[in-house]
UniProtKB/Swiss-Prot annotation:
Its main location: cytoplasm. It catalyses: 2 D-alanine + ATP = D-alanyl-D-alanine + ADP + phosphate + H(+). This is D-alanine--D-alanine ligase. The gene is ddl. The lineage of its organism: Bacteria, Bacillati, Cyanobacteriota, Cyanophyceae, Synechococcales. Cell wall formation. Pfam families: Dala_Dala_lig_C, Dala_Dala_lig_N. HAMAP family: Dala_Dala_lig. Residues 141-349 form the ATP-grasp domain. Pathway: Cell wall biogenesis; peptidoglycan biosynthesis. GO terms for cellular component: cytosol. It comes from Synechococcus sp. (strain WH7803). InterPro entries: ATP-grasp, ATP_grasp_subdomain_1, D-Ala_lig_Van_CS, D_ala_D_ala, Dala_Dala_lig_C, Dala_Dala_lig_N, PreATP-grasp_dom_sf.
Length: 353
């Protein structure tokens, strides 16, 4: 292998409910690196993290990529070590730069970013702070509020609040008075709409809170709004750039997990049919959102737009967005004139700034 090639460690999988999506994203990223213009610059070294958090080197990683699914315990080298990162699968100095393609806890929450930081190695995407704040919806929204960014009204609470009858009654009353129905209950630290429920009355609100509390000790209740769901991709480090704006339209009451991942239940419009001024406002908001949480490298920012009132509300930021061939992040950049091979190369270049 020529020493002039930058050795990129693409790490994927992970001890997360979004393990399968991570594998699909990694396949797209690695395929983009195989483009002729990238083969002259980069050598990819894939690393796989199994569902128990064990790290594996290229031989196992390539098998997971080929099968396009999680490897079961019997498909892994035996005897299995204890769960978690117990040993490094390859010489750490054999990788020049890390490219995490991980979604959810233990991947985009600052943990693996901290590991790469301790290794003194550059990596694609946000650092520890931006990743951690971007993962936790309550911390994220506090940062957005401090930056003066418009958001849908919300309330934060904890799983412990549900165990105190008096405290719970006070919170339920506050939700009904300040947010009203319908409202949405969300775990603070999960992605892909996992654990999110819509509540139209107190019984549904209670059920949603208990369901979310089983997944995360930090909870969020958000006012429901009748609005279009729009997304914008951001790229860069010192100088952030925003993509064209895209829209998600769906055949459901709201954009839940089933709708998101069932073929034919939703479709995208890129670019979104919007007045030019609205698109510009959303692009500016996306960049401000990144600055608010100290996110850089790559991010996808989701907003709500009420075309009747003209209001735009910032929903959330995703600092390690999906990267499958159908995912919004690469699709938005392709529509903005940056094809996949160029996009992954720019992300690597950004990580070295």
């Amino acid at each position: 292998m020529p020493t002039s090639l930058l050795r990129v460690g693409v790490v994927f999988g992970g001890a997360s409910g979004e393990h399968a999506v991570s594998i699909r994203s990694a396949r797209t990223v690695i395929e983009a690196f195989s483009a002729p213009e990238n083969q002259e610059r980069f050598a990819v070294i894939p690393h796989y993290i199994d569902r128990e958090g064990r790290w594996w080197g290229p031989a196992v990683a390539e098998r997971a990529l080929e099968q396009n699914k999680a490897l079961d315990a019997h498909e892994l080298p035996q005897p299995l070590p204890a769960p978690g990162l117990r040993h490094w699968p390859v010489d750490p100095d054999s990788v020049d730069l890390w490219y995490p393609v991980l979604h959810g806890p233990n991947g985009e929450d600052g943990t693996v970013q901290g590991l790469f930081t301790l290794m003194n190695k550059p990596f694609v995407g946000s650092g520890v702070l931006g990743s951690a704040v971007g993962m936790d919806k309550l911390a994220m929204k506090a940062a957005f509020a401090a930056a003066g960014l418009s958001q849908v009204p919300y309330m934060g609470l904890t799983a412990a609040d549900l165990e105190d009858p008096e405290r719970l009654e006070q919170l339920l009353t506050r939700v009904e008075q300040e947010l009203g129905y319908p409202c949405f209950v969300k775990p603070a630290n999960l992605g892909s709409s996992v654990g999110i429920t819509k509540a139209n009355n107190r019984d549904e609100l209670l059920a949603g809170l208990h369901q979310a509390a089983a997944l995360d000790p930090r909870l969020l209740v958000e006012q429901g709004v009748n609005a279009r769901e729009l997304e914008c991709a951001v790229l860069g480090r010192r100088h952030l750039r925003a993509s064209v704006v895209g829209e998600i339209r769906f055949d459901a009451d709201w954009y839940d997990y089933e709708t998101k991942y069932t073929e034919g239940r939703s479709h995208t419009l890129i670019p979104a049919p919007l007045p030019a001024l609205v698109s510009q406002q959303i692009q500016a908001m996306a960049i401000r959102a990144c600055h608010a949480v100290h996110a850089f490298g790559q991010a996808r920012v989701d907003v709500f737009y009420d075309e009747t009132s003209g209001e735009i509300w910032l929903n959330e930021i995703n600092t390690l967005p999906g990267f499958t061939s159908q995912s919004m992040y690469p699709t938005l950049w392709a529509a903005s004139g940056i094809p996949l091979p160029q996009l992954v190369a720019e992300l690597v270049d950004t990580a070295q700034e």
